[in-house]
A protein has these predicted regions:
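Hydrophobic ligand-binding cavity/cleft-lining segments
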Residues: 1-57
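Exposed alpha-helical structural elements
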Residues: 11, 21, 59-63, 134, ...
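Subset-of-secretome marker
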Residues: 23, 37-47, 95, 141, ...
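Short, solvent-exposed secondary-structure boundary motifs
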Residues: 23-31, 67-71, 95-100
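Glycine-rich portal/gate segments that line the openings of hydrophobic small-molecule binding cavities
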Residues: 36-91
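Beta-strand/loop substructures that line and gate deep hydrophobic ligand-binding cavities in soluble
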Residues: 49-50, 74, 79, 86-140
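A conserved amphipathic terminal alpha-helix motif
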Residues: 81-82, 132-162
Length: 162
């Protein structure tokens, strides 16, 4: 998965290091509840972010509710390196409380002709016999939509529209 920004790598990375950005991004996420659990800035320009988002069970598709009762509480961690040579890398993990689901991924933010490009690769694992693959595909498609929404929000944030 990849998404492009009109702004340069430095501006995008600067947003990722801003607590106000994360609070606003979470508020814009569409989750029923969203919180910034922690943000830690390193002296090298790195940033570690932990978030929790809750989706109420009434909003979940049948494919999900037949295997998970109640609300989905999604924890996500992003650990971005500081900028080096107009580039930053991240390790991203996600899990759902009480569900046999895990997401692990790697992201690269680097310069492009248009400004910056974020490339994201993720592995989704659902440990449910027989239907795990269907759920993995569903979650993968949701990740694509989420990446697009986050790119649009980040673009608006950098432009001062949020």
């Amino acid at each position: 998965m990849a998404t492009d920004y009109d702004a340069g790598v430095g501006k995008v990375h600067s947003a990722f290091c801003d607590e106000r950005y994360w609070v606003a991004r979470l508020a814009d996420s569409g989750a029923d509840e969203a919180r910034l659990d922690s943000i830690t800035l390193g002296p090298d320009g790195s940033v570690d972010v932990v978030t929790t988002q809750v989706l109420r069970s009434t909003r979940l598709p049948a494919l999900v509710t037949q295997f998970h009762r109640g609300d989905l509480e999604i924890q996500r961690e992003e650990s971005w390196t500081g900028l080096a040579d107009d580039r930053a890398d991240a390790v991203i993990t996600g899990s759902i409380s009480g569900a046999p689901v895990s997401v692990t991924g790697h992201a690269e933010l680097e310069a492009s002709d248009a400004g910056a490009r974020l490339t994201f690769q993720a592995d989704v694992t659902v440990r449910v016999p027989l239907v795990g693959g269907k759920l993995e595909n569903f979650i993968g498609n949701q990740l694509l939509e989420l990446l697009g929404a986050e790119q649009r929000f980040t673009t608006r944030w950098i432009a001062g529209e949020c």
